[in-house]
Amino acid sequence: MDWNIENGYFANGVKIIAGTDEAGRGPLCGPVVAGACILPAGIELPYLNDSKKLTEKRREALYTLITEQAVSWAVAEATPEEIDTLNILNASQLAMRRAVAMLTPQPELTLVDGNVARDFPMSAVTLVGGDGLSPSIAAASILAKVTRDRALVALDAEYPELRLAKHKGYPTKEHYAALNAYIDAHGGEIPPIYRLSFLKNLHRE
């Protein structure tokens, strides 16, 4: 992946650029997780790309490289409760702002994947498909995806009946069936890890 986007800003005098992206907007449960990353300018990381286009093994390998070689990196989340209160778009923005706020040094410019950048305390530029165009955003997307997948594997150990390690919380038929079975077995209780605003398609009999 080339550095054309970042290089354009470097050429105009910007010295510190971060990328940020989120993972987990679509699942029924768990947090939405954001990554933020400042990479050394021009660094080449093998196979760096949009995290969704990489195998799990390659994401894990890149996660290690990124965390070892980044100038600064961070991950943050918004909880299911925050998602239900704010909506998923606003919660995703909140998670990204939290992640960027944890970076040291603070960036002069943040490249934000997507078409929305709300309330960032520094200059922020949106980039649709940025995780496939900007190394800074691609690195952030990998940090977010790996962190969220690990969180769902941990939740799987807590709720083995839901098989979260397999579907990572996404709305599959198997997930809906497992959730219905869990609710039936627990007196109508929905686990607190769920985003209640996402359960409109949960058909109870």
Which role does the model predict for each range below?
Residues 1-205:
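RNase H-like, Mg2+-dependent phosphodiesterase core
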